Amino acid sequence: MAGNLLNGLRAAIAFLTTLPVRIVDGDYDAFADRQYLFIPVAIVTGLLLGVAGTLFQCILPAPFAAVLTVACIFLLTGINHLDGLSDFGDGLIASGPREKKVRAMKDVHAGAGGLLFMAMDLLFLFALAMTFAGSPTWLFVPLLVAEGCAKVAQITIIAFGKSAHEGMGSYMIARMKKEHYLAAVIGAWIAIGIAIIGAAIIPGGGNPLRVIMAGGLAMLSPLAVALIILIISDRNFGGVNGDVIGAANEIARIAALGVMGAVLWMRF
């Protein structure tokens, strides 16, 4: 049992980050059977990004801190999810019947829709990172919360989506266990809640009630993002695939940061 858990954890790290991990036969099967492992990897990733972002925030002007923070996000998590967002954008922008949209999404070349979605992703990340970097709020908690929320959106898509076609997405969907999904969401909310409460009680972190409200709304945002993506994907592609799951990661990260940033900056 412990061996299978370790195998799954290795695959989760390799799948969700760029950290060098040696994969052996059976690791991805172990990960697919234990998809709650999305969350511990997300929390560790968020911790690393939070430390890096806060360090940049302490020693650099806000624009430079924001650029380096965004760079670290993709250096640590890779661009597989960004590529999924690009393919998702190509499929949505393509006009015509569902079959044409699916072909556009599966095309290996990035089209106008994909380039637009990637550009908007980077612009939103930069703007939101700069919003926090230039404020009294430390980047640590928003980055940690955003990574946890991104993975909650992904596993929600996997748990409740139907496969559009055979591939990595259908493989993960077929092996998702609802009890593992529930455990993952609860685990993510506990970890995020601890981080938010910590941020609220630290002196100089801003209005505690506003911090808690921002964090609470951010915790709910990946469920809303996943629901919207599921509806859009079903209408346009007849279901979800790996690209849709990857797109959910990028969109939910931005949504969580956006919700937190908006609430913390409200003048009331």
Curated annotation (Swiss-Prot):
GO CC annotation terms, alphabetical: plasma membrane
Cellular localization per UniProt: Cell membrane
Pathway(s) annotated for this protein in UniProt: Cofactor biosynthesis; adenosylcobalamin biosynthesis; adenosylcobalamin from cob(II)yrinate a,c-diamide: step 7/7
GO biological process: cobalamin biosynthetic process
Reaction(s) catalysed (UniProt annotation): alpha-ribazole + adenosylcob(III)inamide-GDP = adenosylcob(III)alamin + GMP + H(+); alpha-ribazole 5'-phosphate + adenosylcob(III)inamide-GDP = adenosylcob(III)alamin 5'-phosphate + GMP + H(+)
Subcellular location, principal: membrane
Major enzyme class: transferase
EC number(s) recorded for this UniProt protein: 2.7.8.26
Keyword Cell membrane in record: yes
Residues spanning the membrane: 1-21, 36-56, 59-79, 112-132, 138-158, 182-202, 212-232, 244-264
Protein topology in the membrane: Multi-pass membrane protein
Isomerase among keywords: no
Entry's Gene Ontology molecular function annotations: adenosylcobinamide-GDP ribazoletransferase activity; cobalamin 5'-phosphate synthase activity
Cofactor(s) of this protein: Mg(2+)
Domain of life: Archaea
Keywords: Cell membrane, Cobalamin biosynthesis, Magnesium, Membrane, Transferase, Transmembrane, Transmembrane helix
Known function: Joins adenosylcobinamide-GDP and alpha-ribazole to generate adenosylcobalamin (Ado-cobalamin). Also synthesizes adenosylcobalamin 5'-phosphate from adenosylcobinamide-GDP and alpha-ribazole 5'-phosphate.
Family (UniProt): Belongs to the CobS family.
Protein name: Adenosylcobinamide-GDP ribazoletransferase
Species of origin: Methanocella arvoryzae (strain DSM 22066 / NBRC 105507 / MRE50)
Encoding gene (name): cobS
